[in-house]
Amino acid sequence: MADLVLKNARIVNVFTDEIDTADIAISGNSIVGVGTYHGRKEVDLHGKYVCPGLIDGHIHIESSMLCGPAFEQAVLPHGTTAVVTDPHEISNVAGLEGLDFMLETTKNLTLSVYFMLPSCVPATDLDESGAVLNAEQLRPYYGDPRVLGLAELMNAYGTVRCDPKILQKIRDCTEAGKIVDGHAPLLSDKDLNAYIAAGVQSDHECSNIEEAMEKFRLGQYIMIREGTAAKNMEALMPLFREPYCSRCMLVTDDKHPGDLLDSGHIDSNIRKAIRLGADPAVAVKMATLVPAQNFGFKQRGAVAPGYAADLIVVSDFES
């Protein structure tokens, strides 16, 4: 018998983009069944919606001006249960000391905080910064299970022109079995092909649908950015349908504290997508299953047997 059964739930099925009515059986921290179940403890949801915990696949926590525990307090009530952060802002100022600070202050939180290592400190060789992080310095961090890969590769032209310092960072990342995030605004044609061939899996810099479609057709995951500074969702609304939505995810990139308080986090992006015409189940999928698949989270991102009981309950999609 299950430890807990959530009765009469309307489940957002991110595999079929449907809303299913069923019970959810949970034992320990795992979902063990979806259907008709009884358990030691039962909670009647009376038709409320159950979604997987929301994932922000690209954010700089520093832009919130909050340390780890305070950031958790800001986003967890909005249904965010995991974030993937690139600490390049603090690393450009404080180097490894800043990176270590971010890793340490996000340990043992209810919010799962994963990291992509800052790839460009400084952003280019023309930049000046408070630190320089080379491949040798970053290499030991790939042994940390919370480190998922190499963050946005901002020096796109250095990558295309085979800068040995950049290629070594990519090589270290891929040899560790991790992934590489992209940052290549308006890169196109042969340069884009070369950039992706270097091993860059995703991009969050698309500002128009033509750019997004070119990158999508070449195999990249597209991160649809809607945060405090950059707002690209409206221009990219054609991606909120199959076959595109299964490889596109919602991210914030930067979210200032006032915006977190006033409008929320990824939940705000879902609501906006729905207002702009997206199917609610599709919008939820793009903030759950797709980022989970991109980053290799095997037990996150869906309400299904074998997945973590990492769930949120909402009355409606509008509020």
Give residue spans per PLM region:
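Histidine/acidic-residue-rich catalytic or RNA/ligand-binding cores of hydrolases
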Residues: 96-99, 162, 189-196, 232-245, ...
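Divalent-metal coordination cores built from histidine and acidic residues
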Residues: 72-177, 243
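His/Asp/Glu-enriched, well-ordered alpha-helical/loop segment
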Residues: 239-315
